[in-house]
Every structure is written in C-alpha cells, then in structure tokens.
Amino acid sequence: MTDKIRTLQGRVVSDKMEKSIVVAIERKVKHPLYGKFIKRTTKLHVHDENNECGIGDVVEIRETRPLSKTKSWTLVRVVEKAIL
C-alpha cells in the first residue's frame, strides 16, 4: 500500500484561535463552457502547535488524522513570513 501524504501551500487568513490557524488554498479551475480559468479558494483549519504563524504568512501544511471536528491538517513549516 503506497499512500502518499498530501501537502499543500497556502496563506494564513486567521490566527485568532489557540494552536489553530485558518489557511486559504487558491487553485485555478477551467470554466466548463467558456474555458476561462477562475480562481477558487478553499479554507482549511490547521493545527499550529507552537503558535508560530501570523496573518499573511505563506505556509506548507500536510494532511493528518482528525484532531477535532474541523481540523485534519498540521503545519509543516512557514515558507515566507508576512511583511507588516
């Protein structure tokens, strides 16, 4: 059995929770009729053990076992810190 662990990159949009962040993942989808590429956004709740992320940071996340009702992703690393 070769299960590949899913990893994604996105931008932090909320860090108001304790040990949790909300990450927005952007993807481009082709419109079925007109063919134009449209941006679609998915928001994921991510476990941030050390509270190291801030709003605007670009982060890498990976899928894990369910940690709560909405959290099943964990923070791997901060790719780029936000300039405030």
Swiss-Prot record:
<dbReference type="InterPro" id="IPR019979">
    <property type="entry name" value="Ribosomal_uS17_CS"/>
</dbReference>
<dbReference type="Pfam" id="PF00366">
    <property type="entry name" value="Ribosomal_S17"/>
</dbReference>
<dbReference type="InterPro" id="IPR012340">
    <property type="entry name" value="NA-bd_OB-fold"/>
</dbReference>
<dbReference type="InterPro" id="IPR019984">
    <property type="entry name" value="Ribosomal_uS17_bact/chlr"/>
</dbReference>
<dbReference type="GO" id="GO:0019843">
    <property type="term" value="F:rRNA binding"/>
</dbReference>
<keyword id="KW-0689">Ribosomal protein</keyword>
<protein>
    <recommendedName>
        <fullName>Small ribosomal subunit protein uS17</fullName>
    </recommendedName>
</protein>
<dbReference type="GO" id="GO:0006412">
    <property type="term" value="P:translation"/>
</dbReference>
<dbReference type="InterPro" id="IPR000266">
    <property type="entry name" value="Ribosomal_uS17"/>
</dbReference>
<keyword id="KW-0687">Ribonucleoprotein</keyword>
<comment type="similarity">
    <text>Belongs to the universal ribosomal protein uS17 family.</text>
</comment>
<keyword id="KW-0699">rRNA-binding</keyword>
<comment type="function">
    <text>One of the primary rRNA binding proteins, it binds specifically to the 5'-end of 16S ribosomal RNA.</text>
</comment>
<comment type="subunit">
    <text>Part of the 30S ribosomal subunit.</text>
</comment>
<dbReference type="GO" id="GO:0022627">
    <property type="term" value="C:cytosolic small ribosomal subunit"/>
</dbReference>
<keyword id="KW-0694">RNA-binding</keyword>
<dbReference type="GO" id="GO:0003735">
    <property type="term" value="F:structural constituent of ribosome"/>
</dbReference>
